[in-house]
Regions:
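Membrane/wall-proximal cationic-aromatic binding patches
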Residues: 35-120, 373
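Serine-dependent acyl-ester chemistry module
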Residues: 106, 161-354, 358, 366-379, ...
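Start-of-helix register in tetratricopeptide repeats
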Residues: 309, 485, 519, 553, ...
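Register position in tetratricopeptide repeats
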Residues: 286, 320, 496, 530, ...
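Short coil turns that delineate tetratricopeptide repeat
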Residues: 152, 305-306, 339, 481, ...
Length: 640
């Protein structure tokens, strides 16, 4: 029979042994299963520059293991070591901040970056896109410390639409609804390698057995409805306020400037789900019988004071009759009463403004700005694609508001750029056709399934595109082609098709996204030169050479331009360097061009014998090179 001490020891061993095994398994997984490591950022290198790249798969910890689709972060790059010469801005939010339906140059972060680089060319401007589809303030509050660790100078917040259907919104377990702190503990537990391994194994099994369409809106909402003023709505919006305060304090405690915005949506978009649809009303509105429609709706309103469709059609009827104030009131009620809460109710914006006032954080009234710029002061299709994602023009308005607030605050570096913001046009903002057409495809796919019904989105760019252009944008949408390759392919096609401005815009979009790549700068410089924009061409050539000093083609092109401008000393240095780089290589034409350029310099400075010698070498390398033949003939004719 065991003594008391031995019995206690046996019990301790029986308890500790499994824990030790789990600890050993955890340590083993950390050493021998690196794929389970999922840091927020990873080190990367661009040429010789040490960078940090955002882990696009980081959001998996916030979604159930059996989720068919897990949203991703944009895998942006920033310098690993932030110096005084770097001004870093983080754009944080949901799908609207991500840029849906766009991917490249028409998003809020891209437009903010473009304007800041225009206004402040001296510092290196980094604008990182930390928006993602289907996330909410629960996720952002958890991410905030990791974001703050990366030392941004400013954080721009645009979030509030996904509070109901984002992670642990209405779908949170009942115990987490009672004790919200458990949500944070759950996220921490998912950092444990054993938990992560179990999640991935379960997720792989579950996803392999799932059929049907991949619909993120259906997946995150599960069709759950929420009534206006219900206890669940009050809980979710209250939690949003707590999270927002926590997010702001996380950054402010580190001395990081925060600029928030309220959120906006289309009031002209009908509710997704309501108590009744009132099928007899839309035909009356469509046929112009507004007074009759209004009378019927007022009767219906008396029987149900909180029906979204009743209020929506009341708003439409009042708008048609010219009563814009009443129209706006009913349309706002309809949005708030929509049982499917994909648009933030008015209470969300009230919370945003209230928290920002309490925390002394500037808050941009984007919803008011959109209303002021919309027909009759009612937001709709002029600035929105569907229920809440803005068009390129809408995103530009939000970006301008953020930049304007940054200028007003004393946080930006000294300006050495052009006065005033760039205008909203494709050339100034480098809005590539490829990205804008991608938006049309993306919206068509989004609105062609639940919860949308009978929604037709315009696609003027796709409708007027040729087959090759349509194929290129379709391939990038289907992920058959990556964005960099697609942009290079598209720009080359447009260039060969004689549409130089479109190619220039696309190269510009690539440069904004990948500023450390020399090749888009070289091609853009060549097109600007051919278009006669010599000043911008020279600036772009210089940047390309700074990124790749061994690129002979950029050196030759710049040398020839400088010769024509009378800057002979620098031109000689550039062209001589190009000859050194191409020496011993089978590159007769570039070498012939460099020799021709040196001949032109000699001719312009009066050294005719040396000019002829360089021309002889140029024609030896490329006997049919016309510029060398013409210059030689001119020199000989002048000598006679």
């Amino acid at each position: 029979m065991l003594s008391g001490k031995r019995r206690l020891l046996f019990r301790l061993i029986s308890v500790l042994f499994p824990l030790v095994l789990l600890l050993l398994l955890e340590v083993s997984l950390r050493f021998f299963a690196p794929s389970l490591d999922s840091p927020f950022v990873r080190e990367a290198a661009v040429d010789t520059v040490r960078m940090l790249q955002v882990n696009r798969a980081y959001l998996e910890r916030y979604f159930p293991a059996n989720a068919p689709m897990v949203p991703e972060l944009k895998p942006g790059l920033m310098r690993a070591r932030k110096t005084k010469g770097v001004f870093r801005v983080f754009c944080v939010g949901e799908s609207s901040m991500l840029g849906t339906p766009y991917e490249l140059s028409a998003t809020i972060p891209a437009l903010v970056r473009k304007q800041l680089r225009h206004l402040f060319p001296a510092p290196e401007i980094e604008v990182m896109n930390f928006g993602a589809s289907a996330i909410n303030s629960n996720v952002v509050a958890d991410l905030a410390p990791s974001l703050a660790d990366l030392s941004p100078d400013a954080v721009l917040l645009y979030l509030g639409h996904n509070e109901f259907y984002g992670p642990d919104g209405v779908g949170a377990p009942w115990i987490e609804k009672k004790f919200p702190a458990l949500t944070e503990l759950k996220y921490r537990a998912r950092d444990i390698r054993i938990v992560r391994l179990a999640q991935r194994m379960l997720g792989s099994f579950m996803r392999g057995s799932q059929d049907g369409e991949r619909n993120l809106m259906k997946q995150v909402s599960r069709g759950a409805t929420v009534e206006a003023g219900s206890a669940e709505e009050v809980r979710v919006i209250g939690r949003f306020g707590e999270n927002l305060r926590r997010i702001i304090k996380t950054f402010r405690d580190r001395g990081i400037c925060v600029i928030a915005s309220d959120v906006t949506s289309s009031l002209m978009f009908p509710p997704f789900i309501s108590g009744a649809r009132h099928e007899e009303i839309p035909p009356l509105i469509a046929s112009g019988n507004f007074t009759e429609a209004l009378g019927r709706l007022e009767v219906l309103k008396g029987t149900d004071t909180a029906d979204a469709f009743t209020d929506y059609w009341l708003g439409r009827a009042h708008l048609a009759l010219g009563d814009t104030r009443e129209a706006a009131r009913f349309l706002r009620r309809a949005r708030d009463e929509d049982l499917l809460k994909f648009r933030a109710p008015a209470r969300t914006d009230s919370i945003i403004h209230s928290v920002c006032r309490e925390e002394s954080v500037p808050c941009i009234a984007v919803d008011s700005i959109f209303s002021a710029l919309s027909p009759a002061g009612i937001t709709g299709a002029t600035l929105f694609w569907e229920h809440l994602h803005p068009t390129a023009r809408g995103y530009d308005i939000i970006a301008r508001a953020f930049v304007g607030e940054m200028i007003r605050l004393p946080i930006l570096p000294p300006s050495g750029g052009e006065p005033g913001l760039l205008p909203f046009d494709a050339d100034s903002l480098s809005l590539s056709w490829l990205d804008l057409a991608y938006g049309e495809i993306s919206v068509r796919a989004l609105t062609g399934r639940w919860p949308f019904t009978d929604f037709i989105s315009p696609s003027p760019l796709l409708d007027s595109a040729d087959p090759a252009e349509r194929k290129m944008v379709t391939d990038v949408y289907l992920k058959k082609t990556g964005w960099t390759d697609a942009c290079l392919q598209f720009a080359s096609y447009e260039e060969k098709s004689g549409r130089a401005r479109e190619a220039i815009r696309t190269y510009g979009a690539l440069i904004e996204e990948y500023p450390f790549e020399y090749y888009p700068r070289y091609r853009r410089a060549a097109l600007l030169r051919d278009e006669g924009d010599i000043t911008r061409a020279v600036a772009e050539y210089r940047r390309a050479i700074a990124l790749n000093p061994a690129h002979a083609y950029s050196l030759i092109d710049l040398g020839l331009i400088l010769n024509n401008a009378g800057e002979f000393d620098e031109a000689r240095v550039r062209l001589s360097r190009a000859l050194e780089l191409t020496g011993g290589k089978d590159l007769p034409l570039p070498r012939a061009q460099a020799c021709y350029g040196l001949a032109a310099i000699c001719a312009n400075t009066g050294d005719i014998p040396k000019a002829l010698a360089w021309l002889d070498e140029s024609l030896r390398l490329a006997p049919s090179y016309a510029p060398a033949r013409q210059l030689r003939a001119q020199i000989l004719a002048h000598a006679r």
